[in-house]
Amino acid sequence: MRINSLDALLHTVKDRPRKRLVVAWANDAHTLEAVSAAVEAGVVEAIVVGDEAVMTQVCQEHGLPKERFRMVHVATDAEAATRAVAMVRAGEADLLMKGLLSTDKYMRAILNKEQGLLDPGAILSHVTVMEHPGHPKLLIAGDVAVIPEPEFKEKAAILGYLVKVAKALGVETPKVAVLAASEQVLPKLSSSADAALLSKMADRGQIKGALVDGPMALDGALDPESARI
């Protein structure tokens, strides 16, 4: 079944066993409110790692039932990241979430060669799933958070992650637009040349399971009228 909205995604997840979510440094209202809503929706069981006194106070001030969370006390945000990652490694949690700590501390724990989460040689990237009222389907994009200037090998990995997520959402043959500043293939513009190469690799079966085209501009990828013009 293809999932075309975030509501449909939520309903699908509700029908499955709850995942165990661990949050690194859950010391703020926004984080605890979001996690509380996920617990209430029946999506996750929550472990929140942070300053227990602060988290308890936030729950009291914002009317959040403390019993929805398993609280793990640590003194610092860096320690929270390390502890949360360790819980995933040990099989005590299934999902990792960033709370109110800096991205560099969060990533440092994930990428730690001895105690992190990545296999040797693996590429860490980012995939986001979005809903737009003017578009009938979910939009899946990457990488917009982790790798600011990906090299070709990283772009190929990102494309693979996008396809994997799309298929998990029920898209049998995902259509992937590789974006660039120019829709012409310009050797001096690496983004356009890389996009063309990824497209050709898909044509030749080196990238499987998706229709890939590029280089493309964002408007042409999303709007049929723009593409026609």
Question: What function would you assign to each model-found segment?
Answer:
Residues 1-47, 51-229:
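Anion-binding alpha/beta catalytic cores of soluble intermediary-metabolism enzymes, centered on
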